[in-house]
């Protein structure tokens, strides 16, 4: 049975390849998100400057600075650039993602919180973009999500990293 599946697998892949770029998606929003944001390969104007700044921050902060993958940081930059949020909340460990989130829209109010006690949000201000990346602490993720979900709008975007880290996530 394994041999048959092994022989069929390339043909299954070939039959599905036309849907790879989102052409099987019916929602216009999801189609644009897949084709123009996730699969985007064009280098943006700020990538080189951000990578240089990231290297400088790594040298200055040492082990207290988490370097995220280029793929994730660039996706976050493109997401902020596309959505143009007024309020960005970055909850988790200090990392290179903060540079990319802030430079996507320089005029946005940026809030970083590594602990719940640091999460200060003004009353009545909605959270337009939330990035949670502290997978080792599921209670922190749940509490930040609960706080920010109460302040979300229809245009709010939540990005949660490490959801497969543990069963509790």
Task: Give residue spans per PLM region.
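A short alpha-helical cap/connector motif
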Residues: 1-129, 135-159, 163-169
């Amino acid at each position: 049975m394994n041999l048959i599946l092994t022989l069929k697998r390339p043909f299954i892949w070939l039959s599905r390849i036309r849907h790879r770029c989102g052409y099987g998606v019916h929602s216009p929003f999801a189609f644009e998100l897949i084709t123009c944001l996730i699969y985007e390969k064009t280098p943006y104007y700020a990538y080189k400057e951000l990578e240089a700044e990231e290297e400088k921050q790594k040298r200055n902060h040492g082990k207290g600075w988490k370097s995220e993958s280029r793929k994730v940081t660039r996706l976050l930059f493109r997401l902020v650039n596309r959505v143009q949020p007024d309020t960005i909340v970055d909850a988790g460990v200090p990392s290179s993602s903060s540079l990319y989130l802030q430079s996507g829209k320089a005029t946005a109010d940026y809030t970083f919180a590594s602990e719940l006690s640091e999460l200060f949000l003004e009353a009545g201000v909605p959270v337009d973009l939330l990035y949670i990346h502290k997978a080792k602490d599921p209670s922190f993720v749940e509490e930040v999500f609960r706080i920010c979900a109460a302040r979300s709008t229809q245009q709010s975007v939540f990005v949660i990293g490490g959801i497969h880290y543990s069963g509790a996530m």
